[in-house]
Each structure stands twice: as structure tokens, then as C-alpha cells.
């Protein structure tokens, strides 16, 4: 059994002392873990995080002007999130769930989650440093998520949840300012994650171990920082995966800020494959 749920906390009315967004994210995840235990679905499979002004530095809308006056809001969020995982004895490093974190212009800290009775199998990308192993350059606490996760379903089916994926090699952003090349690199990373997921699936119990996935068959959400870049992104996807691929024809495109200010596009995806022989 799986549980789908939501948490929304307003920074205006639900502040956690003087800790700001860090305290709010800690509270949200602490409450989440308690709710999951009560529901009998303690294992997080996939999480979606939406933060107002994710690249900002304080309460001002002008993040650039505030640069250097404090910790970036995404890094504040990461601090509270990781501490909540640690306090609740949840896997904050190896075994962390698949997740994404996107920026919205205004609103509450919004978390959507999918949880189950059985822990998922985490999947990493060999082209990238695991997010939870990022160096301190990216903040005092690393992001808490795996690149993807495999979750067993009934009837031998297996679900693949791919975290938000972008133009990062190792731990560094590549192709800054070039949305076409960022899209190509993102697709290369998706291929690497799917290949790693197929290798990992072989370690599942039968009949789930026969499940296999294809990038072209993924259902995806494409987050774009600038709406004017949508056409260029779609052209690259059509060129690389084929304009008639399921990936291209069923993609959902949303405008959002990405967790790093130099990233222009991020793609998350999911799929279900049959493990039945």
C-alpha cells in the first residue's frame, strides 16, 4: 500500500521561532515522519518540494541584491530537511528517497510525498556525485535525496521515480547560459540513471527483477526557468529521443526556478515496468 499526501506551511503564519525557512522545513519533515509512522507507511518513495523564492537570500524578492547577507533559501531548506531526517533516524544519506526542489514565486512551503510500507531501492548516477555527498561549497548541509528510486508494486510491477535531473557532472553545473546544451546534458544524465536503475532492478526479488526501463518511454515533467526557452528544449528532446517518443509527446512543461541559479532546465520522470516473465 502507498500513501500520497501533502504538507503546506506558510512562512507568515507557521514560523518556527527565529530559524526561518530552516526551522519551517525541519518542522514540516518532522511532522511528516510522525504521520507516516502513524499510517504504517514509514518509507518515503518520492518527494516534491516547492519553495517560494528558492534562489533568494532573505525576505526580499531581490535575491541578487541580498547576496552575501545570509544563506540562500534553498540551503536553509536543506539544513532543516537533513536535520529532520537525522533526528527521526531516517536515511539522510545512502537510502534517501527520490526528490526534487523547485522554486515558486510566492506561497507556502509545499511538500507532496509518496510513501509505502517497504523501503525503495535507491539509484545513483555514475556521472554525478551523490547529492548527499556534495562538498560544503553548496551549503552547510547537503541536499537529502537519491538520484532515483525503485519501488516494488503488486503483480510484479516496479515503479521508477527519477529525481529532478539537470546539467550537472560530478557536482558542478556545466554549460551555464546555454539551455540547449543543458538540455542535452540533462538527457545524458537521464540515460545514465535509467541504465543504473536497470542494473539495480536485477537485484530485486523475482518477478520484479525482470523489470526494465527506457528513457524514451518515461513520463516526465520539464521545469523551465524562462518560458522563452521551451521551444529550444523541445527541439533538443525531439532530436535526441525522437519527436514521436512517449517522452516527447507526453511531457508536461512547467515554469519554475531551479535549485541552482545557473540551471535553466530540470527534468523529473517516472515509469512503471512489468517484472513478469
Where does each model-flagged region fall?
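N-terminal presequence-like segments and the immediate start of the first folded domain
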Residues: 1-51, 55-218, 224-277
